[in-house]
């Protein structure tokens, strides 16, 4: 899945990193996904780091400390260490404020590396633009390649903003432009993201690798729907529409609520069995308090059907997926769509917006349905068919299991290692690195 620079594949196979510095400045890999700024990127970093360590590659993940009670080092897994770097005041800061604390963060990283007895780093992999701003001076100081994953891009997000949402600042756009110029290797989650890097940011195709994210196929598996419904305290005949993710305008949980209200207009007989579950916490602009979503449900006349649930560990989340009739992912922007893949791995079809990486995460018409735009009426029509045509829905569920089986984290790491080897090889040819 990872692209290779022509003519370098054979040579790059002999170069292997022994120790990697990953940077996730604005959100800790120890945070619960679905809360604050923690989401699919956090899952990505943790799952990749664990599997790299299983292959003998040590990974240190640098993040900003948010409490004086946090120790400088936390072992996340054998071979994976989270390093909490003091930079700026403790507590949660808005991402727009973090740019002011890049210098102390960089200083903290350099000091941590200088004091560490385990040897130097072979490569720096940064996640999100803020991490990249801290990562490129560190990589240059150490003389190692910089690999960067955007995860989301300002220009792309600004082209698909939800109504009332705040555009990404020009400062971020300029920062991403700089990273495209400075990084030795850019990792795209999908072919669509790779094209965006090339077309909107002028990235050289030879320095872009497409590596699909994965899913934990040992946790997210098919199981008894009846048992999962019982665990959630729901009757066996429940029609469960599921949303998983941070409660923010970008993720568009309001579209699901409006679609559910429209669904009942189409078929009022569904009301006694319908439940809409929103599993996730507050984040980002808009929806400053979860109760605002409750107000919307009340205004739509479906407050009695909506369950607002806090983010939960994967061992619990899997039961929501198994119990769901369909998982709805109506995002305005999505770099990949991990929730959609997790749902399919559990055998539950997906109805999603045709944006970003979701056409890769969901096989339209096979494992789910992709919808152009965010009109609740369009979602309601598809959901009604999903509910009233169980055989169609079951075929999609089975196809989703097959589709997700090809998106393992092991395959992701295979692709990343190919990109790492290529970056290391190119770096050796052009010492000092770019």
From Swiss-Prot:
Mg(2+) binds at residues 321-322, 324, 348. Transmembrane segments: none annotated. 1D-myo-inositol 3-phosphate binds at residues 26, 37-42, 95, 128, 152, 172. It catalyses: 1D-myo-inositol 3-phosphate + UDP-N-acetyl-alpha-D-glucosamine = 1D-myo-inositol 2-acetamido-2-deoxy-alpha-D-glucopyranoside 3-phosphate + UDP + H(+). Gene3D superfamilies: Glycogen Phosphorylase B. Coiled coil: none annotated. The keyword Chaperone does not apply. One of its GO terms (molecular function) is magnesium ion binding. NCBIfam families: mycothiol_MshA. Belongs to the glycosyltransferase group 1 family. MshA subfamily. This is D-inositol 3-phosphate glycosyltransferase. It comes from Thermobifida fusca (strain YX).
